[in-house]
Amino acid sequence: MAPALIFDLDGTLIDSAPAIHKVSNDVLRARGYAPLGLDQIRSFVGQGAPHLVRCLLTTAGEDPEGPLFDAIYADLVSRYETDVEGNTLYPGVITALQRLREMGCPMAITTNKPYKPALAAIAHVGLTDYFQLVIGGDSLPTRKPNPEMVNEARRVLRRPHALYIGDSEIDAQTAQNAGLPFVIYTEGYRKTPLDALPHAAKFHDFSALPGIVEGWTWS
C-alpha cells in the first residue's frame, strides 16, 4: 500500500517569500515604518504568522508583545488572503504530484501559515485538487514543530506508513517529534547546513521525489 505523504507548504511546494515580503512591507508602510529586504523577510518565515508579526515589530523598534500586535496581525492575515500573486510553485511540483497520485499516495499539507491564506495560496498555484487535507497554523491549538498537525493528517489519511516532506529546521523537528521519516527539499528556506539536519532522504529536484517514495523500504 502506498504511503501517506504529508507536505509542508512554504519553501517546500511554493516559493511564498516574495508574496510574504510584499504583504509585510505593505503592512509596515501603512503605519509609517521602513520596508524590509526580501532576505530578511524570508528569515522570518516558517514559524507562523504570529512569529512573523513579532519579528516585524521588533525590527520596527516596537514591543513584539505590545498593543500593536493584534492590529498588525489582523492586517497581515487579511492581506494574505487576497494578495497571492507572489506565490509560485517550485519547478516540477505538479508533475511530481500527478505521479504520486497515480501511485496511490494520499496527500496532505500541514503549514504554520494561517488556514485561509494557505488555502488562497494553494488555489492560486493550482494545488487544491491534489490534497485531501490542509491544516493551517490556526487550525489546531498548536503549531509545528508540535506533531499534532501531522498526527491529525495521519489520522485522516489512514495509511500505516507516512513520510513527512519539508525544507526547514522546523520541518526536521516536526518529523522527529511525529516519529516519521523526513524527506528534505534542499532548495527551500533552510538556514542550517544540510548535514546538520536529521533527514532520511533529500532531493533538489521534484522529479526525484516519486522515485524516492516508490523505492522506500519500510522496516
Curated annotation (Swiss-Prot):
UniProt pathway: Organic acid metabolism; glycolate biosynthesis; glycolate from 2-phosphoglycolate: step 1/1
GO biological process: DNA repair; glycolate biosynthetic process; reductive pentose-phosphate cycle
Binding-site positions, Mg(2+): D8, D10, D167
Entries under InterPro entries matching the protein: HAD-like_hydrolase_sf, HAD-like_sf, HAD-SF_hydro_IA, HAD_2, HAD_sf, PGP-like_dom2, PGPase_prok
Cofactor dependence: Mg(2+)
Pfam families per record: HAD_2 (PF13419)
Similarity comment: Belongs to the HAD-like hydrolase superfamily. CbbY/CbbZ/Gph/YieH family.
Name assigned to this protein: Phosphoglycolate phosphatase
Record gene name: cbbZ
